[in-house]
């Protein structure tokens, strides 16, 4: 299968320039079209008014009932001679031409090719192409006339109820057409120049408008791993970029948090591994410094075994979290009775709880949930181990289970010193300890609660913690059917 070559999208500057220029040029051409159309309509109305004025004058002469035809035609010729750029033709009731403008073709010969004038508003007005002849122009001397606007109307005394003549009047429109063509050419030239100017102006405006984007880009490029505390000021950018800057600040804040946790994680894991390794080396060096009895060597080996077991557990926990980070932690779900699972965990911690004088209590129904039994037991074990570490002797750790709206809640409560609110959001971070020294003996590796969160998330649930003067409360919420 042949993949299509990657085609980079057009730049924002190109697209903005294209659309703004297109819209502006289109608006200019629309204005030009409206102007040309308005001029055409204006000239058409002006010509029609002239034609009506001429026809009214000639109609008065030809309608005179007491005049002979010869007298009418003589008067007609006197009147027509006073009009320039006008052709007249007069036909009798038999369709025979009885008069037409002297020195000009009979316009009736061209009338059959006349077309209706679309620019004329009202009245039967036609356009003629021809005849062609030289006639006086408007301030231009003589010019060639070949385009006419024509009307025809019945005139003269009535015979059998009908006028005896049909009058044809044609007015030259070449001067108007020349004016319109000249105007169109000028508008086209002007539009071409303006279009080029618009493109350059828009390009310049877009370039200037993108200056804040380039400024933000430069600021972002200057941020390195050593400057993750730097934030962009949203007040210094246009409002269109404010959300982008805020989103970037949120992103860099998350990166800073991850980077800090990663740095702390590297330091913590190095410290956690260094301590048992140092103990192993020290104890081995002491054992080898002189001859030892078998009992002394066994004690050293047992001590080393404890350190190695602790390291193995920590490595196992880290591999578990790595699987969770890469979405490889897939629970093998089956329906479980949480009361039974809590009972198994209680059995495991019962001896330790008795040694510390702490009572373990379970309150609630036999909640059913779809989950991985080993994972859920591990999460409960980590919570109980954490609770035993901080519960004073003579107190009780209570595990509650309840089902609300198809959600199963597992609550682990223990009395003890409350945790400061600023620590609560980070309790589930790896190697995070409330004690700033982070080195309390017997506190564990510091990743137990991180494992709890990974297991709960793998089961599509949530885990939260609250703490006050009455104690600390962890709440796990799991979907009943997974």
Curated annotation (Swiss-Prot):
Checking InterPro entries in the record gives:
CusS-like_sensor, CztS_silS_copS, HAMP_dom, HATPase_C_sf, His_kinase_dom, HisK_dim/P_dom, HisK_dim/P_sf, Sig_transdc_His_kin-like_C
Q: Where in the cell is it found?
A: Cell inner membrane
Where are the Cytoplasmic topological domains? Answer: 1-15, 208-482
Protein's organism: Escherichia coli O157:H7
Q: Does the keyword Cytoplasm apply?
A: no
- Record's protein name: Sensor histidine kinase CusS
Instruction: Name the gene.
Output: cusS
Manganese in keyword set: no
Quote the PTM field. Answer: Autophosphorylated.
Please state the Enzyme Commission number of this protein: 2.7.13.3
């Amino acid at each position: 299968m042949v993949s299509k070559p990657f085609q980079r999208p057009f730049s924002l500057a190109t697209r903005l320039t294209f659309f703004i220029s297109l819209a502006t040029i289109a608006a200019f051409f629309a204005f030009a079209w409206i102007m040309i159309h308005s001029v055409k309509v204006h000239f058409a109305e002006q010509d029609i008014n002239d034609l009506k004025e001429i026809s009214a004058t000639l109609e008065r002469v030809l309608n005179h009932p007491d005049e002979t035809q010869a007298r009418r035609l003589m008067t007609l010729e006197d009147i027509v001679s006073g009009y320039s750029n006008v052709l007249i033709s007069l036909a009798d009731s038999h369709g025979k031409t009885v008069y037409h403008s002297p020195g000009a073709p009979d316009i009736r010969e061209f009338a059959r090719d006349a077309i209706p004038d679309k620019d004329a508003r009202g009245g039967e007005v036609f356009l003629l192409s021809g005849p062609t002849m030289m006639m006086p122009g408007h301030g231009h001397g003589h010019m060639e006339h070949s385009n006419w606007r024509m009307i025809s109307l019945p005139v003269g005394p009535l015979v059998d109820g009908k006028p005896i003549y049909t009058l044809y009047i044609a007015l030259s429109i070449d001067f108007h057409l020349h004016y319109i063509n000249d105007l169109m050419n000028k508008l086209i030239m002007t539009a071409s120049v303006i279009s080029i100017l618009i493109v350059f102006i828009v390009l310049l405006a877009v370039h200037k408008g993108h200056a804040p984007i380039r400024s933000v880009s430069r600021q972002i490029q200057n941020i390195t791993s050593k400057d993750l505390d730097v934030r962009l000021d949203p007040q210094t950018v246009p409002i269109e970029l404010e959300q982008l800057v805020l989103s970037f600040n949120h992103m860099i804040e998350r990166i800073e948090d991850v980077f800090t946790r990663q740095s702390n994680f590297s330091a913590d894991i190095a410290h956690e591994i260094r301590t048992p390794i140092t103990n192993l080396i020290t104890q081995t060096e002491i054992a080898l410094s002189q001859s030892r009895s078998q009992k002394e060597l066994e004690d050293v080996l047992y001590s080393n075994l404890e350190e190695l077991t602790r390291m193995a557990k920590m490595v196992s926990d880290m591999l578990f979290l790595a699987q969770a980070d890469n979405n490889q932690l897939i629970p093998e779900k089956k329906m479980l009775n949480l009361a039974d699972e809590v009972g198994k965990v209680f059995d495991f911690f019962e001896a330790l709880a008795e040694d510390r004088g702490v009572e373990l209590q379970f309150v609630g129904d036999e909640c059913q949930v779809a989950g991985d039994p080993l994972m859920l037991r591990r999460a409960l074990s980590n919570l109980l181990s954490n609770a035993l570490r901080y519960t004073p002797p003579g107190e009780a750790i209570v595990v509650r289970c309840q089902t609300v709206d198809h959600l199963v809640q597992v609550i682990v409560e223990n009395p003890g010193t409350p945790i400061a609110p600023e620590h609560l959001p980070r309790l589930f971070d790896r190697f995070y300890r409330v004690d700033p020294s982070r080195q309390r003996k017997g506190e564990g590796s510091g990743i137990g609660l991180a494992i709890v969160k990974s297991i709960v998330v793998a089961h599509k649930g949530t885990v939260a913690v609250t703490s006050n003067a009455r104690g600390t409360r962890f709440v796990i919420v799991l979907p009943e059917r997974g």
